[in-house]
């Protein structure tokens, strides 16, 4: 069997090299799903790809890194991840992905990211270079962030602190009560489950209505107006400046 090495290129790892311009040469460069250069070269300046192709024009004095036996692939992005927010599910102190409360739009996931998480180097070794970390728990859980899985601290790792607001739509599944179920294992009646589900949906409507009312009140510039963090976090969502991601599993 023919064996070969595969390299997933994480440019931010090569801090010393990136001080100037660098040309990376490789046996194969997978630029896009349909664009491949064999062999190929990549010109990088300050961590940004400037040119890519079978052969690029190397600026005078730039560093040449020859990886002739390796293959370069784009890094993967892990969407809707708890990377850096959770370590061991069985230990509550290591889980920062869930906040207390059902409506917490002012929660920002990047603040709780642990840059020393043992899961980060494992993900990076498998080709994942970035992750969209999402707060979980409740109905409106907060704002996700895009982080790079390389850096000395959370500030350096964070690419975008505010990606989107996340809303977890109430489950529509109904559990059929069993005649022999007792105690905590006995589910509520079908009518009670439907009532609870409808109530959760009404609470979402009410929350957005209150956020809109806050927006209009603030626009009127009343005296002694004090900002409220939760409603302030909703303003860019209501104005369309920040997207909202709705999670619906059923």
Per-range role (PLM):
Residues 5-16:
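Bacterial N-terminal signal peptides
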């Amino acid at each position: 069997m023919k064996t070969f090495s595969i390299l997933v290129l994480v440019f931010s790892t090569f801090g010393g090299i990136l001080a100037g311009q660098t040309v990376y040469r490789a046996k194969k460069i997978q630029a896009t799903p349909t664009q491949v250069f064999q062999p190929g070269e990549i010109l990088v300046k300050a961590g940004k790809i400037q040119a890519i192709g079978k052969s690029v024009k190397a600026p005078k004095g730039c560093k040449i890194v020859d990886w002739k036996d390796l293959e370069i692939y784009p890094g993967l992005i892990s969407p809707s991840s708890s990377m850096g927010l959770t370590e061991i599910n069985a230990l509550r102190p290591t889980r920062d992905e869930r906040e207390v409360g059902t409506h917490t739009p002012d929660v920002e996931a990047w603040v709780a990211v642990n840059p020393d998480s043992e899961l980060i180097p494992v993900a990076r070794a498998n080709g994942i270079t970035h992750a969209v970390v999402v707060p979980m728990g409740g109905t409106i859980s907060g704002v996700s962030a895009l982080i790079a899985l390389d850096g000395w601290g959370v500030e350096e790792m964070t690419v975008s602190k505010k990606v989107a607001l996340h809303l977890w739509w109430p489950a529509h599944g109904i559990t059929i009560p069993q005649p022999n179920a007792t105690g905590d294992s006995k589910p509520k009646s079908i009518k009670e489950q439907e009532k609870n589900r409808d109530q959760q949906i009404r609470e979402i409507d009410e929350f957005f209505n209150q956020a809109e009312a806050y927006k209009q009140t603030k626009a009127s510039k009343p005296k002694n107006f004090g900002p409220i963090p939760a409603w302030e976090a909703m303003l860019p969502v209501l104005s369309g400046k920040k997207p909202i991601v709705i999670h619906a599993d059923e």
